[in-house]
Amino acid sequence: MINIFDMMGPVMVGPSSSHTAGAARIGNMGRTLLGEEVARADIGLYGSFAETGYGHGTDRALLAGLLGMKPDDLRIPNAYEEANRAGMAYSFRTVELCDAHPNTALLELTGKSGKQLTLQASSIGGGAIVVNKIDGIDVNFTGDFNTLIVRNQDESGSVAAITSILSQVHINVANMSVNRHRRGGDALMVIETDQHIKPRQVEFLSELPGILSVTYYDKEDDEDGAGFDEGNL
C-alpha cells in the first residue's frame, strides 16, 4: 500500500528521487552487502541511468552511497572528492542488461580485504530500489525490511535450520526466497524480517552447518528486536 510519504518522495539531496536518492540507496546497499569499506568500484550504468544519469547526479549518488552516505547527505555533490579522499578507486561504463529496469546499476565491488561482490539493483521511483542479482544469482528485495542474505550449500535442512532458529527467538519472517545457480551448488536465501536482528544472532546463524556466509541489512528505521534466548538454543 502506498502511503503519503511515498507520494511526497524521500528527504534527499536532489535533483531526482530516481536518479539520485535511489542511486544513493543502491550504493549504500552494495557497501552493506560487501560488509566492509569499498576499495574499488567498477560501476555499470544501464538505460536512463546511462543516458541521463550524469546530468542528474547518478554517478555522484552511487559513489556517495558506496562511501556510506544516505540520500539526504549534503556531501553528495562532492562525492568524487570524497571518494578520492577515502582512497576509493572507481570507474563508470555503459552496460547492456537483459530485461532490466531502465534505472539499473551493476556494481562490481572489491573491499579493503580483497573481498568481492557483484550487485545489480534498480531504482524504481520515489527513492525506492529493488535488488535484482547478487553475484549473478537472481534475488528480489527492496531494503524496506530488515534482511538476511544467507549463502548456503544447496542441501536439505539449511532453510529449516535458519527459519527454526528465527522462530525460537520470536523473529517473524515477512518474506523469504531461495535461489540457486544449479542443484547442489551454492544457493542464496533472502529473508526479510519484521524484527531487528542483533550481531550475535547473525554470527550464530553463520556458524550453522552448510552455511557459507550471512550478511545482514538493517533498514534505516529499524526497531529494537528480540535477543537470543540462549536457553532455547
Name these PLM-found stretches.
Residues T52-R60, P102, A187-E192:
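Short glycine/threonine-rich loop-to-helix capping motif typified by GTGT followed
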Residues L67-L117:
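Contiguous domain-boundary segments centered on the initiation and propagation of an alpha-helix
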Residues M1-V11, A41-G44:
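Short, hydrophobic/aliphatic alpha-helical segments
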Residues F92-V95, L119-L233:
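A conserved regulatory-domain signal marking ACT and ACT-like small-molecule sensing domains
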Residues D42, Y46-R85:
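A structural-propensity feature for long, helix-poor, extended segments
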Residues I26, G68-P71, I76-N78, R85-G87, ...:
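Protein-protein interaction/assembly regions in multi-subunit complexes
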Residues G9-G27:
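Conserved phosphate/anionic-ligand binding catalytic regions in large, soluble enzymes, centered on
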Residues V13, M29-A39, L67-P71, R85-A89, ...:
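Generic secondary-structure signature for well-ordered alpha-helical cores
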